[in-house]
Amino acid sequence: LQSSGYFYAVTSSPYSEEADYRLDTQLLKLEQNFIKKPSVLEFSAKIVLTHISDNQIIGSRIVSLQIPCSQDTPYGGVIAANQATFRFTATATDFVVSHIKRD
């Protein structure tokens, strides 16, 4: 979010006194599925964007990703988890920016 250039500052909860928006995320699923071949990392997380001044939810979304693992090993799952994190971060940034532009 910070590198999007859309925000003056992005801080964590203890420093949010001057914030206009709050982004909450909840990890719903992170597991490597070995039943599928090649194995697949299954990732899902919920994003909720709230306008702080009136505590109104601006938007909410569940992001679900399935990333094929390069290897059917735990290390293959680690590599896929890193890819999922990168994709999730990009998706969350797009979600936040698009909703704030409408607010």
UniProtKB/Swiss-Prot annotation:
It comes from the Bacteria. This is Uncharacterized protein in pal 5'region.
